[in-house]
């Protein structure tokens, strides 16, 4: 069972429809017990970083997400949800994030139109489970004005938009997609299937303990 965290700032409907399409078991929730009972977690997000962190704090979800990370449960952040996984952001004001991934969220420094919106090529930087079954150079759908300034060793895929934009990041059981898999057609569905596979593998490992 995958928990989609509903904190009032996510693209919940499209993520829900995508999981339904691939046949994944899921629940949309902000309940701490349900999140911790799940086998994997998706943190979606649309909007401003400081507001999102305020809402997560108000709903006591920051400690839950950190516990999810600590116990090794697979966690996937999408768009703003990915950005929240990092240590801090400069959006609107200096603001602390969840601190589950090293790095900071910064404004895109490009001469191109901001937000970066539309389809872009995703190039492989290193292997990780969410690349399974994907062709290097597949096109995915972006909508964002900020990017993750983070260590190279956690960057698994990049896109060019006047600069290299980390599209895929990962460290241990924590995964992030700056683009929207749920809006990226069959490529996106494969990515979500791959995450579903990671979740099932983690669930099986817990049953054998």
Curated annotation (Swiss-Prot):
Tell me, what's a Pfam family for it? GATase
Quote the EC number.
4.3.2.10, 3.5.1.2
Entry's PROSITE patterns? Answer: GATASE_TYPE_1 (PS51273)
Q: Any idea which UniProt keywords this protein has?
A: Amino-acid biosynthesis, Cytoplasm, Glutamine amidotransferase, Histidine biosynthesis, Hydrolase, Lyase
Where do the catalytic residues lie? 79 (nucleophile), 180, 182
Q: Does the keyword Mitochondrion apply?
A: no
Answer yes or no on keyword Cell cycle: no
InterPro entries named in the record:
Class_I_gatase-like, GATASE, Imidazole-glycPsynth_HisH
Gene Ontology molecular function terms on file: glutaminase activity; imidazoleglycerol-phosphate synthase activity; lyase activity
Write out the annotated subcellular location: Cytoplasm
Q: In which pathway does it act?
A: Amino-acid biosynthesis; L-histidine biosynthesis; L-histidine from 5-phospho-alpha-D-ribose 1-diphosphate: step 5/9
Cellular-component GO terms for this entry: cytoplasm
Looking up SUPFAM superfamilies in the UniProt record yields: Class I glutamine amidotransferase-like
Q: Name one GO biological process term.
A: L-histidine biosynthetic process
Q: Which reaction does it catalyse?
A: 5-[(5-phospho-1-deoxy-D-ribulos-1-ylimino)methylamino]-1-(5-phospho-beta-D-ribosyl)imidazole-4-carboxamide + L-glutamine = D-erythro-1-(imidazol-4-yl)glycerol 3-phosphate + 5-amino-1-(5-phospho-beta-D-ribosyl)imidazole-4-carboxamide + L-glutamate + H(+); L-glutamine + H2O = L-glutamate + NH4(+)
Q: What is its main location?
A: cytoplasm
What are the residue boundaries of the Glutamine amidotransferase type-1 domain, all occurrences included? 1-205
What is its quaternary makeup?
A: Heterodimer of HisH and HisF.
Q: What's this protein's function?
A: IGPS catalyzes the conversion of PRFAR and glutamine to IGP, AICAR and glutamate. The HisH subunit catalyzes the hydrolysis of glutamine to glutamate and ammonia as part of the synthesis of IGP and AICAR. The resulting ammonia molecule is channeled to the active site of HisF.
What name is this protein filed under? Imidazole glycerol phosphate synthase subunit HisH
What is the species of this protein? Bacillus cereus (strain ATCC 14579 / DSM 31 / CCUG 7414 / JCM 2152 / NBRC 15305 / NCIMB 9373 / NCTC 2599 / NRRL B-3711)
């Amino acid at each position: 069972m995958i928990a989609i965290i509903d904190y009032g700032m996510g693209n919940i409907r499209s993520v829900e429809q995508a999981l339904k399409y691939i046949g994944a078991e899921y629940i949309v929730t902000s309940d701490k017990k349900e999140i911790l009972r799940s086998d994997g977690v998706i943190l979606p997000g649309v909007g401003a970083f400081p507001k999102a962190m305020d809402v997560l704090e108000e709903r006591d979800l920051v400690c839950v997400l950190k516990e999810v990370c600590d116990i090794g449960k697979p966690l996937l952040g999408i768009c703003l949800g990915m950005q929240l996984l990092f240590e801090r952001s400069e959006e609107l004001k200096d603001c602390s994030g969840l601190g589950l991934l090293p790095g900071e969220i910064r404004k895109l420094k490009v001469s191109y139109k901001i937000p970066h919106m539309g389809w872009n090529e995703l190039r492989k930087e290193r292997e990780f489970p969410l690349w399974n079954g994907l062709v290097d150079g597949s096109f995915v759908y972006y909508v964002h004005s900020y990017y993750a300034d983070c260590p190279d060793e956690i960057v698994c895929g990049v896109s060019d938009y006047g600069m290299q934009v980390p599209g895929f990041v990962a460290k241990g059981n924590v995964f992030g997609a700056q683009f929207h898999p749920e809006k990226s057609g069959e490529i996106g569905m494969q990515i979500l299937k791959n995450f579903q596979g990671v979740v099932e593998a983690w669930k099986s490992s817990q049953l054998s303990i």
